Structures are given as structure tokens and as C-alpha cells.
Amino acid sequence: MMRKFNIEDYKNFRLRIFVIGYSDQGESIVTLFMDEHEHVFYTMVVDCYAKGDMNKTKELLDRFHVEHIDLLCWSHPDKDHSVGVDTLIENFCNDKSYILVPYGIEGRDGDCVKYNEGDKQVIQSIFAHNSRLHKAFKPISCIEEGHLQVTSFDLCPLLDDELHIRLYALSPHAEYIAEARYNYKEKQQYIHKNNFSISLCLDIGNSYFFHYCSDIENRTINHIYPDFFEKATFVKIPHHSSKGSANLLDLLPKDKLISCTTIYKSQGLPDEDVLKQYKVRSSYLHTTGTSDDVNSYGIIEYDFDLFGQHSVDVRLYGNAEVV
């Protein structure tokens, strides 16, 4: 059954996106649907990272009095996207939550992936939220150059038509996972974790397209569904702006993009040449921080007023900076 949220007017609708990174590695994105009074009526989180006792994702959810996450996506089991996911499940997921996981990530020894310490605990937490009537665990894949509608809901103003909101998965690709499973069975070759990455597109009213690209790389990008990228409003640049993910530039608009990246310091990411290419076509380009460890985190906040002023306000915290 389609979920519906009543709002007084489209002009009161706000979309807040928080892109969170840390001084050495780590990525999490919190997306809040709210009214003009900052009342949150839908929450989406992609990935998590924590550094010691610091979990900025949890802090943000607490700040906005979020009682439960509607949709949690664990894009792939790399450490810099995974630490603290189990904390979010334990504190914010209930019998209404959906948890997206790449198809084939089931915590078994035969999954053709080398799990990090703690990954299987995350998977156990996810399965623990399954019940007879509500399957929280949603394994995600789609065919090459295809897309999968993950969820949808409508905003219902008093005096206007409903606004349709859709969330699509554009990866990982089922063909590659099947091939990787065969190679593991026959040759004991592990799959590269980034090739499991879930890439999401949030479509608001078929007018605004927000892309959460996790760590997809060129092998996936070369076979990804292109249409939504051609109309992109916002893109979290894949794989910390590496050259190995730069083919996405061929699919994106030539100007007026809003783009951002997290970092992975030990790998020398973001790549300066890749950032220069994004800079040319972006009205806004931000990073969660490439400077020295003045602060141990960086947060980029985008406050979208899509139907009132048709504007975006940007606020930077910690190490976050303009490129």
C-alpha cells in the first residue's frame, strides 16, 4: 500500500541532506524529509562510520528527534561504510524499517567476499528485524542498464495534486554477482567489494534527481542505467572521487550540478584531477575535508527548498570545505 504524508503546501516541504565524513576515512549520508518547523516525517540513511565514541550519524538523528529510520541502506561491506551500522539498527530500526543490503551479502562463508570484523554482526542484526509479517531485509540487485524501484510514497498537500517520490536502485548488477559467485566456486576468487555497491537515485516529482553513488566504479558505471544521471540535481561522487570511478562524468549534465565527495586519506582520495572535472560542471562542489586533522570529522549540509524559493542553503561543519 502506498504511503502518504499530508502537508499543508509544497512550499513548506524541505529536503535536508547531510554528507558525513571523517579525517581519515568514513562515509554516511542522512536524508531528512521535513516541514518548515523541522518536523521529520521520513528518514533515509545510507551507510555509517564511527570513530571511537564519535558517531555523527547517530548524533544527527538524535538532534532532529528521529525516532526511527524508514529506510537504511548498507551500500557494501567496506569498513569505511560499515562501522556503526549495527548501532543504527539497534537504536533506530523498528518493525516499519526497511534495510537494503547488496544481493549476495548474507554473512555466509560462501558469499565470495572477505568480510571485515563486525560485518557478520551487522548482518545478524538485520535478519533479527525480519518478522513473519515484515521482512526488513531487502537484498538489492538489478540487471545491467536497468533499475529497480525500491520504495515510493506521496506528499499530499491540501490544495494541490499529490507529489510522487520514488527511490530507485541502479546497482549492483545481478549479472556480475552471478559471474563472481561462479568464479568463487570454481577458482576461489573473491569479489571486489566495490562491485557490490548499491547506487540509489531519489526521484522527487520527476523533476529533481538525487544520486547516492556509494563506491561504484567504472565497471559498474559502464553498464548503469543512464537516464536519471542526465537529469541529476545532486550527486555524491562515487568512490571518494577516484579515477577508477571517473566515467560517471560522461553521464552527468555539463553544468549546474550540486556535487560532493568524502575522502579516503591513505588512498590519496579525492583525486585532484577528478575534482577539477567536477568543478567545471558544478554550481556547488564540496568535500568533507582534505585539510590536516583540525577536526576529526566533516559534515556538508544541504537544505533544499525545492518548491518555494527553488534554492539550496549549504552549511559546512568541522573539516568540510568548498572546492
Functional labels for PLM-detected ranges:
Residues 2-9, 95-164, 223-224, 255-323:
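Binuclear metal-ion centers of metallo-dependent hydrolases, dominated by the metallo-beta-lactamase
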Residues 18, 73, 100, 168-170, ...:
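Hydrophobic/aromatic beta-strand patches that form the interior of the parallel beta-sheet core
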Residues 37-44, 51-102, 226-242, 253-257:
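Active-site metal-binding motif and surrounding structural segment of the metallo-beta-lactamase
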Residues 84-85, 111-113, 180:
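Short, solvent-exposed loop/turn and secondary-structure capping segments
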